[in-house]
Regions:
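Short glycine-/small-residue-rich Rossmann-like dinucleotide-binding loops
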Residues: 69, 75-76, 95-96, 221, ...
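Residue-level detector of alpha-helix initiation sites
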Residues: 76, 136, 177-178
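Glycine/serine-rich phosphate-binding loop and adjoining beta1-alpha1 elements at the start
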Residues: 2, 8, 79-170, 298-300
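Glycine-rich phosphate/diphosphate-binding loop of Rossmann-like nucleotide-binding domains
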Residues: 6-42, 152-240, 287
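Adenosine-phosphate binding glycine-rich loop
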Residues: 118-159, 269, 274-361
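Rossmann-like adenosine-cofactor binding region
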Residues: 209-291
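An N-terminal-biased, well-structured beta-alpha scaffold segment characteristic
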Residues: 2-106, 110
Length: 361
């Protein structure tokens, strides 16, 4: 199979879908890898490293898309790439269709096979291709939230972990999955007072067992969230319904309960966001303010640390890429239920129930 690795062109997206080591593995399995020139540069991987691995360097994205049977990307195709995708071409990337109707319609029209990293699901209901980026995003949400709390950024001027004699910030994490767990551990590790809210009592029991003493757990209800907001400095939105649009857990009216200069970080923004006042931002212009509350809603948070993110992503995606290349997507999805669940669009039809339900299809 011919595998194409185009350069990511979304705003400040510096990751690449495959490392030189990953390319070498695919080539050793009898496949050809074509990489757009400088695609890995911002992640720390040069053209020469890809060439040494056996990959071929192409100059333009048009060349990469034209030659490839399977396109591997990091982020969803953007408008300028729609026309490059052809019928029956396999596109293996994060799509997040539930928050991108225009993208969904474009991919349906293209006739491509869209296999989404975020809905590949194992028998134990874990999402193996979402986990590594969720780990990165969860940790980074605390870094970015802490910066936003600084006075020059428009925040309250609070140090997240406090100092002896001065109380730390209070962090509320909405969602106790991978993102929320990593965010809570990161915040607790630097001394913040953390509350994790989730709708699953078994998950809250588990989190209570593994978290340090400065982390509380709470059943996620509107009433409980409203009670906490007046004393909360930083809220991390980490809610996930696989493939579906995220629910709005904080409405605009609820912002009035918070103190001016408090911060919302919406990690769920790539699935529509879990705050009513959220809209996607970029690394170039990451923060805006609504009713005195700072909103950080960057849709590709891990793109800011591309070296770490690219290695973590390739570790997760490469085994699946090898299966797809060796067997072809149809046989691979017949024999591997987790890959079958990754199928979102095939031959112009939405085949992922969560996406179909979002748009009433």
């Amino acid at each position: 199979m011919k595998i194409g690795i185009p350069k990511e062109i979304k705003n400040n997206e510096s990751r690449v879908a495959l490392t030189p080591g990953g390319a070498k593995t695919l080539i050793q399995n009898g496949h050809e890898v074509y990489v757009e020139t400088h695609a890995g540069e911002n992640s720390g991987f040069s053209n020469e490293q890809y060439i040494k691995s056996g990959a071929k360097i192409l100059v333009t994205p048009e060349e990469v898309f034209a030659i490839a049977d399977m396109i591997m990307k990091v982020k969803e195709p953007i408008k300028s790439e729609y026309k490059l995708i052809r019928r029956n071409q396999l596109v293996f990337t994060y799509f997040h269709f539930a928050s991108e109707k225009e993208l969904m319609l474009a991919m349906m029209e293209s006739g491509a096979v869209c296999l989404a990293y975020e809905t590949v699901e194992k028998a134990d209901h874990t999402l193996p291709l979402l986990i590594p980026m969720s780990e990165v995003a969860g940790r980074m949400s605390i870094q970015e939230g802490a910066r936003c709390l600084e006075k020059p950024k428009g925040g309250k001027g609070i140090l997240l972990g406090g100092v002896p004699g001065v109380k730390p910030a209070h962090v509320l994490v909405l969602g106790g999955g991978i993102v929320g767990t990593q965010a809570a551990l990161m915040a607790a590790g630097i001394g913040a007072h953390v509350t994790i809210a989730d709708i699953s009592l078994p998950r809250l029991r588990y989190l209570s067992e593994i978290m340090p003493a400065n982390v509380d757990t709470l059943m996620s209800t509107t009433s409980n969230i409203e009670d906490l907001l007046p004393q909360t400095d930083l809220v991390i939105g980490a809610v996930l319904i696989p493939g579906a649009k995220a629910p709005h857990l904080i409405t605009r009216d609820m912002l009035k309960l918070m103190q001016p200069g408090s911060v919302l970080v919406d990690v769920a923004i790539d699935q529509g966001g879990c705050f009513e006042t959220s809209h996607p931002t970029t690394h170039a212009d990451p923060v805006y303010t609504v009713d005195g509350i700072l909103h950080y809603c960057v849709a590709n948070i891990p793109g800011a640390v591309p070296f770490t993110s690219t290695l973590a992503l390739t570790n997760a995606t490469l085994p699946y890429a090898v299966i797809l290349a060796n067997m072809g997507w149809e046989q691979a999805c017949i024999k591997h239920e987790d890959l079958k669940k990754g199928l979102n669009i095939v031959n112009g039809k939405v085949v992922c129930k969560a996406v179909a339900d979002t748009f009433g299809l």
